[in-house]
From Swiss-Prot:
GO terms for molecular function: (4S)-4-hydroxy-2-oxoglutarate aldolase activity; 2-dehydro-3-deoxy-phosphogluconate aldolase activity; aldehyde-lyase activity. Belongs to the KHG/KDPG aldolase family. It comes from Pseudomonas aeruginosa (strain ATCC 15692 / DSM 22644 / CIP 104116 / JCM 14847 / LMG 12228 / 1C / PRS 101 / PAO1). GO terms for biological process: Entner-Doudoroff pathway through 6-phosphogluconate. Its EC number is 4.1.2.14. The keyword GTP-binding does not apply. The gene is eda. It comes from the Bacteria. This is 2-dehydro-3-deoxy-phosphogluconate aldolase. Pathway: Carbohydrate acid metabolism; 2-dehydro-3-deoxy-D-gluconate degradation; D-glyceraldehyde 3-phosphate and pyruvate from 2-dehydro-3-deoxy-D-gluconate: step 2/2. The active site is at 48 (proton acceptor), 136 (schiff-base intermediate with substrate).
Amino acid sequence: MHNLEQKTARIDTLCREARILPVITIDREADILPMADALAAGGLTALEITLRTAHGLTAIRRLSEERPHLRIGAGTVLDPRTFAAAEKAGASFVVTPGCTDELLRFALDSEVPLLPGVASASEIMLAYRHGYRRFKLFPAEVSGGPAALKAFSGPFPDIRFCPTGGVSLNNLADYLAVPNVMCVGGTWMLPKAVVDRGDWAQVERLSREALERFAEHRRH
């Protein structure tokens, strides 16, 4: 079993430095490099590549090899087999939409840190029993949003979250006002229409704006 405390520390460092994790779904292989470059130019250098399309693992592999300065993670990992494939492709972290006992146990034996998805106290307790203390609240908005995060801080004072799902510029301040939020995940810097037309300059602008707003709210 790899040291879970060390992997938790790596998640902490990732979230502290990243601040915002863009959640990326690759529909065209040709978009992989220019999209990542645009996000990075805007300051977003840790990317969660979802495995929702056939290009997900390819994107992780290519970016890990061709953009080694970026931190590339795998998202939408649903089972141990997919976790292993993401690790083999070069993912430096793994994010799941939910958690199962099988997946939590499997990840304990991997060098790659896992950020498990949770939406309830019961799911937190399941992962907590295995030693996990850092979570993705997903889908954040429909799971109670900032109010749920505040409520979780009572029985679970030592856990921290990366809320994802419904987080946007409009409600970013509400999430960042909650002390147990360490970073946020989102897609708002990658509007579908913008990506479809390959407007990478706009992706860069939206990424920079997102980080500026994050810094503004975390100062208060």
